[in-house]
């Protein structure tokens, strides 16, 4: 269904969707608009005493584009057509966002519209809350459950807290984190904390934390010297 949002740049921003109640927001306030994953068309009405124009961030132009004029004078409108948010062979159809900036001709008044399209919620989580390894295990593999594509996994981040871990890396698909270290010849177990995270287009961060324990070296049993019992003196 085609929807209309009215923008009054000079004084207030008026938001109206269908027959819903209008919401009045003071000028220069950012506005968030959320639509379903389905393809559709969205229109924005603009009211200002003078000239105005609207622009879109470059990254969003792959799935969202303007139809008709993107500038005017006084009362006017601009229309946005957007694609369905679904798996396209590269992206899984995660939630996404386009950014529109409406600005008056003098450049002194502007409103930013965050145009958000619903989709799959990102998932990144370790398969276990903690991992325990023997003292002589020097390579650790930590599996990660994720619904991100290889392309999207490039924006995953991870952090290792544990100075005894000598090296680490994440696989290109974000499905595994590898840790390397030395044999633990110490008397105490070594503990590291690993966090993996992903921030989506809406600015929400999804994270998971796990604990890695490398056990201490087993203590060798003490060697006891076998003593012969003392010979008793014969009493006569």
Give a label for each model feature.
Residues 90-106, 188-200:
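A short beta-strand micro-motif common to beta-rich folds, especially ectodomain repeats
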Residues 15-37, 65, 205, 213-229, ...:
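Bacterial Sec-dependent N-terminal signal peptides
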Residues 45-79, 148-178:
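Surface-exposed binding patches on compact interaction domains or structured appendages
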Residues 2-10:
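Sec-dependent signal peptide recognition
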Residues 42, 76, 94-98, 140, ...:
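Exposed beta-strand face motif in extracellular beta-rich ectodomains
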Residues 33-39, 131-137:
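Short, solvent-exposed loop/linker segments at the N-terminal edge
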Residues 107-120, 202-218:
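C-terminal edge beta-strand
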